[in-house]
Amino acid sequence: ETDDATMTSPFDPDRPEDPLAPPPERTPLGAWVDAEDYRVRVVAVEDCEVEPYFAPRPGHRKIGVHLELTGLRDEPVPVNGLFATLLDSTGEPHRPTPAGCRPTLPAGRLEVGQTTRGFVSFEVAEDASGLLLRYQPIIVGRVPRPITFDLGR
């Protein structure tokens, strides 16, 4: 018998990791990964310069992860910076921040052969290290595997 109050949706980005799952494969900067519906790579990682009113909290900085994605299937695949999560060496997840590096990754859908690119930005501690980017779009009817990139920082 299961307790429905403790079950989490497979689409919940805050759900706990599966302790029996193998460790995620870590793709290096610049390398393409072909998922079932799309291919993706991290082009660059940069410190963001923002307007003073968007400045990070004291002791923090904003970094931008420049993503490039291409649709691989006849069915359009959703693209959105909100599908990205940044993890640091402590395992703490960081959600995207709306004010950061430009141009931002546009939200939308990619048709087969169509490519888009842009930054997804995060606010992290000045001394954050071991940064990993996990990208996992929400696709109706199934849960695509997350793709993890080693950001080399």
Q: Residue ranges of each PLM-predicted region?
A:
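Conserved functional micro-motifs across diverse proteins
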Residues: 1-153
